[in-house]
């Protein structure tokens, strides 16, 4: 669906995207995370041609964006919707006419516009706000209008640029649920740029970490958060050094979905008759699953027998 090959971009002589490689599958919800200024929004805008790039290729729907221009670029952008942090609604127009605007630009007949706007308002659960002005809407309602407008032309891809950054946690959750519904019902590919880790955990299937214009790693959300690299730890502000004991050996056991590592730990203590301490643990929700990990502290003399036990039971673990 979307393939980015060795893409680089310069601003005023500075290389803001550096040899970026990414593949985003059709129908998935994909996250791009990083600190402010990391290059994530610039990368997102390269996907729909709002930003040009200097090197490499961005291939969408099998077409290289560098080879698309004029009328063909306009047709291409019809297939890619986008929502923003600040909603970008027209304050002088009511909800109906904000949503209908792209349809009007494309010359869709009025009766078809009315039908499509009604359908979209039902999808985003705002039928009672059809004649309201943006000034009379909450932040969450404004974003729902923006989502409806972005979907007006039946795009195959929806790009979300910090779409929940201006919203409170409860409203953010409702918007994420809406996006998941849209993904499920319409099969639309969603690419989300965010610095909010809870957004990634709540909706994304896979995620790429970008820092200073470089893709540091890409993978399943669960794996990147439950067994984070040093780069991911830096992003989420996690440091084991302040938590884990300096004496003994610390072993982290990962709890993926549909696992029984919790029972494994108690069985290990009983069967091996060894002492250890549980020094750190957490449970987190990823989409519909609750996953977690814990760290046990063991003595040097018990290291071999405990590690052999974990290996023999196919546990997911590492020395922390």
Curated annotation (Swiss-Prot):
Gene that this sequence comes from: metN
Residue stretches making up the ABC transporter domain: 2-237
Topological category with respect to the lipid bilayer: Peripheral membrane protein
Keyword Translocase attributed: yes
Family assignment from sequence similarity: Belongs to the ABC transporter superfamily. Methionine importer (TC 3.A.1.24) family.
Principal location: membrane
EC assignment: 7.4.2.11
Keywords, sorted A to Z: Amino-acid transport, ATP-binding, Cell membrane, Membrane, Nucleotide-binding, Translocase, Transport
Subunit architecture: The complex is composed of two ATP-binding proteins (MetN), two transmembrane proteins (MetI) and a solute-binding protein (MetQ).
Entry-linked PANTHER family: AMINO ACID IMPORT ATP-BINDING PROTEIN, METHIONINE IMPORT ATP-BINDING PROTEIN METN
Organism: Clostridium acetobutylicum (strain ATCC 824 / DSM 792 / JCM 1419 / IAM 19013 / LMG 5710 / NBRC 13948 / NRRL B-527 / VKM B-1787 / 2291 / W)
Pfam annotation, one family: NIL
Sequence positions that bind ATP: 34-41
Catalytic activity: L-methionine(out) + ATP + H2O = L-methionine(in) + ADP + phosphate + H(+); D-methionine(out) + ATP + H2O = D-methionine(in) + ADP + phosphate + H(+)
Cellular location(s): Cell membrane
Enzyme class: translocase
Protein name: Methionine import ATP-binding protein MetN
């Amino acid at each position: 669906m979307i393939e980015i090959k060795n893409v680089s971009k310069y601003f005023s002589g500075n290389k803001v995207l550096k040899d970026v490689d990414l593949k985003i599958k059709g129908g998935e919800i994909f996250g791009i995370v990083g600190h402010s200024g990391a290059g994530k929004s610039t990368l997102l805008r390269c996907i729909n041609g709002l930003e040009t790039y200097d090197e490499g290729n961005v291939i969408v729907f099998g077409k290289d964006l560098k080879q698309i221009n004029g009328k063909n670029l306009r047709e291409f952008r019809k297939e890619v919707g986008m929502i923003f942090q600040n909603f970008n609604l027209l304050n002088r127009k009511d909800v109906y006419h904000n949503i209908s605007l792209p349809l009007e630009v494309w010359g869709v007949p009025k009766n078809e516009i009315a039908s499509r706007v009604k359908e979209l308002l039902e999808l985003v659960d705002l039928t009672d706000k059809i004649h309201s002005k943006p000034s009379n809407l909450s932040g969450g309602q404004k974003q729902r209008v923006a989502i409806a407008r972005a979907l007006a032309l039946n795009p195959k891809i929806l790009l979300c640029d910090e779409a929940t950054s201006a919203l409170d946690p409860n409203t953010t959750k409702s918007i994420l649920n809406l996006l998941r519904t849209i993904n499920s019902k319409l099969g639309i590919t969603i690419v989300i740029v965010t610095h909010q880790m809870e957004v990634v955990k709540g909706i994304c299937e896979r995620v790429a970490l970008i820092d200073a214009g470089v893709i540091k790693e890409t993978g399943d959300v669960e794996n990147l958060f439950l067994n984070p690299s040093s780069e991911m730890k830096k992003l989420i502000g996690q440091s084991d050094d302040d938590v884990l004991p300096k004496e003994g050996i610390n072993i982290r056991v990962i709890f993926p979905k549909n696992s029984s590592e919790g029972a494994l730990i108690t069985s290990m203590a009983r069967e091996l008759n060894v002492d250890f301490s549980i020094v750190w643990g957490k449970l987190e929700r990823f989409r519909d699953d609750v996953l977690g990990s814990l760290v046990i502290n063991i003595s040097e003399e018990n290291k071999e027998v405990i590690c052999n036990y974990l290996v023999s039971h196919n546990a997911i673990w590492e020395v922390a």
